[in-house]
Amino acid sequence: MSRFFATGSDSESESSLSGDEILPKPVGGTFGKQPIILSDDEEDTKRVVRSAKDKRFEELTNLIKTIRNAMKIRDMTKCLEEFEQLGKAFIKAKNIVDKEGVPRFYIRLLSDLEDYLNELWEDKEGKKKMNKNNAKALSTLRQKLRKYNRDFEAPIAAYKQNPEESADEDQEKDEDSEASSSSDDDSDEGMSASKFLKKADSAPPESRSKFLKKEEAEDEESSSDDEDWGSDSDESDSDESDDENKYTSMASRFLKKTVNEGDRQAAEKKKEEKAKKKQHRKVKRKDEEGEEEEDDNEGGGEWEKVKGGVPLVKEKPKMFAKGTEITPPIVVKKLNEILQARGKKGTDRAAQIDLLHLLAGIAEENNLGQGIAVKIKFNIVASLYDYNTNLATYMKADMWKKCLDSIHDLLDILFANSNMFIGEHISEDSENLSNTDQPLRVRGCILTLIERMDEEFTKIMQNTDPHSQEYVDNLKDEARVCEVIERAQKYLQEKGSTEEVCRVYLRRIMHTYYKFDYKAHQRQLSTGQESKSEQDQAENEAEDSAILMDRLCKYIYAKDRTDRIRTCAILCHIYHHALHNRWFQARDLMLMSHLQDNIQHADPPVQILYNRTMVQLGICAFRQGMIRDAHNALLDIQSSGRAKELLGQGLLMRTMQERNQEQEKIEKRRQIPFHMHINLELLECVYLVSAMLLEIPYMAAHEFDARRRMISKQFHHQLRVGERQPLLGPPESMREHVVAASKAMKMGDWKTCKNFIINEKMNGKVWDLFPEAERVRSMLIRKIQEESLRTYLFTYSSVYDSIRMGILGDMFQLEIPTVHSIISKMIINEELMASLDQPTQTVVMHGTEPSSLQNTALQLAEKLGNLVENNERIFDHKQGSYGGYFNRGDRGDRDQKDQYQRKEGGYMRRGYRRDQQGQSNY
């Protein structure tokens, strides 16, 4: 018999269950009233009427749980999906939220999720490890959350100020615990009270800490809830006994309940009382803890509050036992013990450096000699270099300062002790650290320390923001670095080998070649204006950088046995010549070295140095007015479109997919520090202006030449981009200025061309960056006038029968000898079919230039000839005859026409006839 139909006490129900009773048969047919028989599943469930608020909030909390789980495993795709669902669920609960207010747990999630996404976004290494879907979802979710949180700025700010749980959440947790306890009571009816209590005590509180995540304050609250759990269970027992008295039969308990307004108010009142009791218990517990502390204080000494995180003052480790005699062998043995831990896993590198400093102090206190001091200093500097195991990690400021100071101290000791010899060839067994009767011998290489120090300085500059004050402060250390290198150079010149001297010379060159010597430049400009005594004083102040570079490089040319050091020295020497406008010396050195023939076999840093040298050579040629040489020097770098990468000044984003992380790290280590960069906008402007001065006259001379070649593809590309624009406004960028100037030069309008190239905006961007800006501007104006004259003559020569050179000089503001020289060159090179009448200073045109109609007819005839030739070849191929079009009998007519053109001059223009005869034997 089902126990739900049994009435009476618990003992009666148990006795009825023990016996086998027979159910009475119902009276009537099969369609009569059947007794209500519930299944086992229905026995364990309870129908409860839930409010809309509970349903909506439960939906929100379930979604929040899913989001937090996804946050733990860094599943951004799942986070994004659930966040979108959460937004939809919140919109559904809008009516309830308007009445009750935004729930605290919802604000907590928005705040936590925002902090979590910001932390992920700043973690660059973690972002690189994400797959594509997660990275995309992270970016999308971050944007959506920032936009979504604008509506909740005030609640989120209030929550961040006081992230404690609100009373509403406590009430919600009490409701959940009450509901769970009541459901357990109903399902376990018929059991003994002792069994029920045991089950209630052992049951885990499922609803407790429902919304708690990570905060320490909330963890404390959860612990206090654990302490109060017993009292909550007692309250649930009393509520359960009250519920049992309400129902007269078991079946009535499981029928749907109708809740009236009075019952609801009573339930709310009961919840408030529970919350008050809970708060009272917390206050009481705190008071009891305070009393216990007072009792402890009365019984013993006073307790003192100590702030967490205060570092304990550690005693310095004892290097030697008390009473030990400090001798050089003992110190060397201790030094070897410290060095044995070097490089091992788990070794505290900072502590190791401190131990070495402490050992150096002990050796100095006991006057153990300079040999021991030098050996310890060598190991201190080496330990500073080994502090960062990762090659890409740069040295911190305090470590860098210690490194410089240690190297300075080491050099001081070496200069003070002339009887000391150091070198890598000295073995540890043959070292002499303390016997002053013989020369001191220490194993070590000062040059290796200097080179590593220079590399560390480069890494520091590479990893510092170039637009910050920190970069300027770090750059000031270069003076100390150069001082260390200069002192090492003096020491190695006395005691070093030729190979070591070449290496230290190269370090000195690398810190000198890219710097413009303003003092030498000023002395050069003021030569003849100063008295002889002032000149002698200026020469004695400091060695001219040109003399220094010449002396260092020539020593390397003569003594070096490795190709790499000699190649770097030659390139730096050329760069320095070009930087100081010594064009011919730089050009001759480049041509004599033949570096352009085998530079592709050099390592990448040397190739970067070669590219920088060629660029500086081209800029120097431009400043000197050698436009064609400047264009040729810059052509390879600019035509590739990768000038930034080839010069070692950054990586291109479009090539980032072609390299993995290791290759990217290697290429970043090859980058040149910012203070050594070449201005890329200046470089491009110099190249485009050079191309304009060469290309525009050439285009005018070969306007109707179908086979004309392009001097600069990049310049033509810029022209096409300018022509494709539907609406042309005033030029803004540097490229637009050059394109506008080119169009003006095509028309022979040199003044407009000059105004586009030389104006206030272009001066600020480009021309003022040159040391002698005014001289460069005057050179540019002169070149624009000359090339505009050539372009004008090419374009309008068919219009004139003759023209006076005085008129041309007035048009382009050139002297008559200059105009005469330009026109004479054009006639000699067969670019202009004309002759000069010296008495009248007139240019007489020969009139052999074809008109536009004749040029069109020539082009049509040429295209028809090509068409006929192609048709004849196709016909011969189909017929099986391979004699070709050139073997046919009608060739004599064309030969006669070509002979006429050769003898009479014909109507072919300028040098086009000669080019045609050389390219095809028609």
Curated annotation (Swiss-Prot):
Residues 8-21 have a biased composition (Low complexity). It is found in: Cytoplasm. Its main location: cytoplasm. One of its GO terms (biological process) is translational initiation. Residues 165-189, 217-243, 289-301 have a biased composition (Acidic residues). Residues 1-37, 154-308, 885-922 are annotated as: Disordered. Residues 674-850 form the PCI domain. GO terms for molecular function: RNA binding; translation initiation factor activity; translation initiation factor binding. InterPro entries: EIF3C, EIF3C_N_dom, PCI_dom, WH_DNA-bd_sf. GO terms for cellular component: eukaryotic 43S preinitiation complex; eukaryotic 48S preinitiation complex; eukaryotic translation initiation factor 3 complex. Residues 207-216, 258-275, 888-907 have a biased composition (Basic and acidic residues). Keywords: Cytoplasm, Initiation factor, Protein biosynthesis. Belongs to the eIF-3 subunit C family. Component of the eukaryotic translation initiation factor 3 (eIF-3) complex, which is involved in protein synthesis of a specialized repertoire of mRNAs and, together with other initiation factors, stimulates binding of mRNA and methionyl-tRNAi to the 40S ribosome. The eIF-3 complex specifically targets and initiates translation of a subset of mRNAs involved in cell proliferation. Component of the eukaryotic translation initiation factor 3 (eIF-3) complex, which is composed of 13 subunits: eif3a, eif3b, eif3c, eif3d, eif3e, eif3f, eif3g, eif3h, eif3i, eif3j, eif3k, eif3l and eif3m. This is Eukaryotic translation initiation factor 3 subunit C. It comes from Xenopus tropicalis.
